[in-house]
């Protein structure tokens, strides 16, 4: 809660600064040879399928929330709406409000909203989701980006700029499209993957932040390698000033690379879901540090890639549970169904081999 309160205060200060004609600050003494550092973690698709609705969501990240709490700022791709009852899973997701609150309680500070399911319940569903997130922002400091209720909110949230630890960090979140509805409608705003829209966000981010995190929702589902469209966009985003690019949507981990020195994680995969298709239960948590040293030079340290595994009910315990793979290697005796441990290790080896991730 203290982390979120601080982030919220700093976000509000940054909003005031962006809207002010000048930003006067009294300089404070600072020791020589020090660096400003902001640690960030991003996780992939947080989903709520129909079967998940039957279980207590407050256990989903019980075994991995320590990873979410470690960072100064943690962001997650929230791939569902909060459209109210009746709650539904695929193909049109509507989760309980408590699910979003649980993710906040686990340590998630920023909700990434631009994805293909955000209009699953129409304009009304998106509007209600934004109302819930706005209330959470007011009450507990949760922030969001990728969508907005109106032009004023759009200016504040897209890009989302956070000032913390002496660092200004911008999140630029956008999606290739939506499964239903029309994301091009003027309000509520869904940030689309077109060059004009994204270029405007990137320009504002460059001008007002030290580091720019580009978060595209893109790519082909279930493919372990990125496609030509993703690569073209990644190259363009580096030209537009991205400091790091972290993608979502394919529901599996994809390969990583560097383009002109900029780290690119093409897809993180599913953080939690009921999906059991090949490779869909393995995910990456992406951890990095944004650093400005005493000379004013800026750099991204990392990313460090942490593999997570989503166990479904009856495998490790009687609920869904996302676990850090490395912490559970060699502990097959913990599983109710040992074959799931074998599935985890085999999937890990296969994905590492096919993506080239060490």
What residue spans do the PLM features occupy?
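Acidic, metal/ion-coordinating pockets
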Residues: 21-358
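Bacterial Sec-dependent N-terminal signal peptides
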Residues: 1-21
């Amino acid at each position: 809660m203290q982390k979120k309160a601080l982030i919220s205060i700093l976000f509000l200060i940054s909003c005031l600064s962006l809207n002010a004609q000048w930003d006067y600050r009294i300089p404070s003494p600072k020791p020589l040879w020090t660096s400003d550092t902001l640690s960030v973690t991003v996780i992939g698709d947080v989903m709520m399928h129909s079967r998940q609705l039957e279980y207590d969501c407050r256990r989903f990240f019980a075994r991995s929330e320590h990873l979410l709490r470690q960072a100064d700022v943690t962001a997650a791709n929230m791939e569902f709406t909060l459209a109210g009852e009746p709650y539904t899973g695929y193909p049109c997701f509507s989760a309980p409000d408590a699910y979003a609150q649980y993710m906040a309680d686990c340590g998630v500070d920023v909700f990434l909203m631009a994805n293909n399911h955000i209009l699953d319940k129409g304009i009304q569903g998106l509007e209600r989701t934004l109302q819930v997130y706005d209330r959470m922002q007011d009450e507990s400091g949760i922030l969001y980006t990728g969508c907005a209720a109106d032009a004023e909110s759009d200016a504040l949230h897209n890009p989302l700029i956070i000032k913390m630890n002496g660092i200004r960090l911008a999140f630029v979140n956008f999606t290739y499209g939506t499964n239903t509805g029309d994301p091009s409608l003027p309000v509520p705003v869904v940030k689309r993957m077109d060059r004009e829209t994204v270029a405007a966000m990137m320009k504002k981010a460059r001008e007002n932040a030290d580091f720019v995190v580009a978060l595209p929702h893109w790519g082909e589902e279930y493919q372990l390698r990125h496609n030509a469209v993703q690569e073209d966009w990644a190259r363009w985003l580096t030209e537009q000033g991205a400091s790091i690019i972290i993608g979502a949507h394919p529901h599996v981990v994809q390969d990583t690379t560097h383009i002109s020195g900029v780290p690119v994680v093409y897809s993180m995969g599913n953080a939690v879901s009921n999906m059991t298709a090949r490779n869909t239960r393995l995910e990456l948590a992406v951890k990095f540090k944004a650093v400005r040293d005493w000379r004013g030079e800026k750099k991204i340290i990392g990313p460090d890639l942490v593999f997570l595994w989503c166990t479904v009910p009856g495998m490790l315990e009687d609920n869904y549970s996302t676990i850090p793979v490395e912490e559970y290697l060699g502990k097959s005796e913990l599983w109710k169904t040992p074959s799931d441990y074998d599935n985890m290790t085999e999937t890990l080896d296969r994905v590492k081999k096919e993506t080239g991730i060490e």
